[in-house]
A protein has these predicted regions:
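Conserved ABC transporter NBD signature motif
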Residues: 55-71
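Catalytic Walker B motif of ABC-type/P-loop ATPase nucleotide-binding domains
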Residues: 155-159, 164
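Hydrophobic anchor residue at the start of the ABC signature
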Residues: 144-145
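Conserved ABC ATPase signature
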Residues: 130-134, 138
Length: 175
């Protein structure tokens, strides 16, 4: 079975269907790009895959042992996110929160993995800085590191280069 299977999905928001009859499969190792106009349901599909909202009709099934907790997510950035008053290392570590359960602290292994992800995205030198003081490109790298910490087996990116200059966008895709 495919890792992710969408069956006859109808998706919408504000009580209005924006996407109907959607069927798809995603296998391990696949890259899937969802392209469409503003308001066409791209983010709604992401939220439905993550279980943040139900489909209006149809079903999403996970196979091969994949669960929603195995999926990392880089959402569209909002003004609230841009002005978030936390250290970069805290934001990146928060990618592990879905695994913590009732445990109130991150393990040494999780802290080390967060540092590795910061290095991977070229942002290790930002770990002790306040997130809201960073440029848009730096913030996107930090959020990508956070999503990578959460992603055990799958990664969803929702408009990851919006607002970035061409060089920063190319660097983001290069990761």
């Amino acid at each position: 079975m495919a890792q992710i299977l969408g069956e006859n999905l109808t998706l919408g928001y504000d009580g209005k269907a924006v996407l109907q009859g959607l069927n798809f499969t995603v296998e391990a190792g696949d890259y899937l790009c969802i392209v469409g106009e503003n308001g066409s349901g791209k983010t709604t599909l992401m939220k439905t895959l993550l279980g943040l909202q139900p489909p209006l009709a149809g079903a999403i099934r996970f196979g091969d042992g994949l669960t929603r907790q195995d999926i990392g997510y880089l959402p569209q950035q909002t003004e609230v996110q841009r002005d978030f008053p936390a250290l970069v290392r805290e934001i990146v570590r928060s990618g592990f929160q879905g695994r913590c359960g009732l445990r109130p602290f991150y393990t040494r292994a999780e802290k080390a993995e967060a540092e590795r992800m910061l290095q991977k995205v070229g942002a290790a030198d930002l770990a002790g800085r306040c997130y809201r003081e960073l440029s848009g490109g730096q913030q996107q790298r930090v959020l990508l590191a956070r999503a990578l910490c959460a992603a055990r087996r799958a990664l969803l990116l929702d408009e990851p280069v919006t607002g970035l200059d061409p060089d920063a966008a190319a660097a983001m895709y290069g990761l």
